[in-house]
């Protein structure tokens, strides 16, 4: 599902542990790291997509996490021209994302990257909250900055 402006609705997932670190995942067979994210199907709410993607990409269930916050609006990034599939219709020029800040309430041993036939990640680690800003691919950096900045107060004020 792509909106009239060419952006695909998507959810981004910032999963934290009790130390305030975030789960940082390595794309399969690449030296590229990112937060889990994924598209929102036409029949899903952003929260529905969050739980589906959380399970598909990191093997966690609804009961394994607590939602701490969500960005108020959509955060958008454009794909570099080399990644735009110009021959597909409708044309997708980027993603518009709702970002969720989650806290892991179960054991981290439950994190699994291999539950689907086509895993997106082959490794993960805990990193400091702001670490991803200096590591993510350039075209996603501003969205990461905005999401982390908006959601940070909720992490710092949680009970």
UniProtKB/Swiss-Prot annotation:
Its EC number is 3.6.1.-. Pfam families: NUDIX (PF00293). Its cofactor is a divalent metal cation. InterPro entries: Nudix_hydrolase, NUDIX_hydrolase-like_dom_sf, NUDIX_hydrolase_CS, NUDIX_hydrolase_dom, RppH. It is an enzyme of class 3 (hydrolase). One of its GO terms (molecular function) is mRNA 5'-diphosphatase activity. NCBIfam families: PRK00714.1-1, PRK00714.1-4, PRK00714.1-5. This is RNA pyrophosphohydrolase. It comes from Pseudomonas putida (strain ATCC 47054 / DSM 6125 / CFBP 8728 / NCIMB 11950 / KT2440). The gene is rppH.
